[in-house]
């Protein structure tokens, strides 16, 4: 006989399988859509929501996602939370149906801007948390899956998943041969930034000078000074928070920092051009792989499971790099943005 607490636990294995299958289906829908439409159609603005701007490339994927959630709701009670939906999410199924209710935080296409111009992969992100109503937090997520959405020039796509308490898993899908092979997920073991990628998000106009000054200050202190004859730390402005975390988890980046909400506060402006909780829906993939995810001051990252909260975050490839950088980042962020 199951204990009462065991009966209320989410079925992690089932959720991983379902989310992987759903994301692979959405990836296929998107590839067909991209193959049949031009850049002008994909990049057109469809609507502006509280969460973000919805472009033409988003529409087909959104429609398929909602259709599949309706079918899933025939056997499971859950609430879908994502941009473009009702502020409190959309409820599927009814109480008592299936396993314990959960909230599914989704960003169907994280990195839209790069993908709609066929420049760089985006990612489909999902994270499931026990349903605690409006009090559900980002850190409550127990299961996460993220799937690479490649450009039309690319036939390989990575799929990453994580369950709380388990090592991150991965697969590399060959979209031509329709095969999948195991993919090891291991962050960099480097103990510093030398000859590695370390980036401070600085995508859009407004506050760029402040962010650049912060970026320089962190790198200079971390490296013990600046050598004008050497390129020792590299920056990658990947307009995709989920993609940034994947780069760290897969060992390609050592550090990423996004302080845009703090910059807007410093400038005395309100802006939605920032990371939102749904952009971090699959952050469990990075943390279960061994990365250190926190706020810019080194405190645990906390955010509601919604679509409107601006989130500042830092991700370090390993504990050694975090120990090196957290004090530097904290001091420089406080000095420049405090």
Predicted stretch roles:
Residues 33-36, 70-77, 131-136, 221-230, ...:
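Alpha-helix termini
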Residues 76-78, 142, 233-234:
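Residue-level recognition of the N-termini of beta-strands and the immediately preceding loop/turn
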Residues 19, 23-26, 30, 96, ...:
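An extended, acidic
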Residues 1-109, 320, 334-338:
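N-terminal subdomain of lithium-sensitive/metallo-dependent phosphomonoesterases centered on the IMPase/IPPase/PAP
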Residues 59-62, 119-121, 279, 283:
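Short alpha-helical patches at coil-to-helix transitions and adjacent helical residues
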Residues 97-165:
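DPxDG-like acidic metal-binding loop motif
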Residues 65, 69, 124-128, 248, ...:
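Buried hydrophobic packing segments
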Residues 49-54, 110-114, 233-235, 271-272:
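A short glycine/serine-rich beta->alpha loop
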């Amino acid at each position: 006989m199951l204990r009462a607490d065991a009966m209320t636990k989410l079925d992690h294995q089932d959720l991983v399988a379902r989310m992987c299958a759903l994301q692979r289906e959405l990836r296929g829908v998107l590839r067909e859509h991209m193959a049949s439409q031009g850049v002008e159609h994909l990049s057109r603005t469809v609507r502006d929501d509280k969460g973000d701007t919805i472009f033409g490339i988003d529409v087909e994927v959104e429609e398929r996602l909602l259709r599949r959630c309706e079918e899933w709701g025939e056997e499971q009670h859950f609430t879908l939370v994502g941009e473009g939906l009702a502020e409190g999410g959309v409820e599927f199924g009814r109480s008592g149906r299936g396993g314990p209710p959960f909230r599914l935080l989704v960003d169907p296409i994280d990195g839209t801007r790069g993908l709609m111009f066929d420049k760089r992969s985006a990612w489909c992100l999902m994270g499931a948390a026990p349903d605690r109503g409006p009090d559900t937090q980002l850190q409550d997520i127990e299961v996460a899956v993220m799937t690479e959405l490649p450009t039309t020039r690319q036939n390989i796509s990575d799929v990453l998943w994580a369950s709380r308490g388990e090592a991150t898993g991965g697969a590399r899908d060959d979209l031509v041969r329709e095969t999948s092979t195991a993919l090891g997920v291991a962050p960099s073991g480097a103990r510093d930034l030398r000859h590695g990628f370390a980036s401070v998000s600085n995508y859009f106009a407004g506050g760029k000078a402040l962010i650049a000054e912060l970026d320089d200050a962190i790198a200079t202190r971390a490296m013990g000074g600046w050598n004008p004859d050497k390129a020792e730390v590299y920056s990658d402005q990947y307009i995709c928070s989920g993609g940034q975390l994947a780069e760290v988890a897969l060992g390609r980046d050592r550090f990423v920092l996004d302080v845009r909400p703090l910059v807007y506060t410093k400038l005395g402006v309100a802006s939605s051009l920032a990371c939102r909780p749904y952009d971090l829906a699959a952050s469990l993939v990075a943390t279960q792989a061994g990365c250190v995810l926190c706020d810019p001051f080194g405190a645990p990252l906390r955010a509601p499971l919604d679509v409107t909260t601006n989130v500042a975050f830092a991700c370090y490839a390993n504990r050694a790099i975090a120990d090196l950088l957290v004090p530097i980042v904290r001091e420089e962020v406080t000095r420049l943005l405090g």
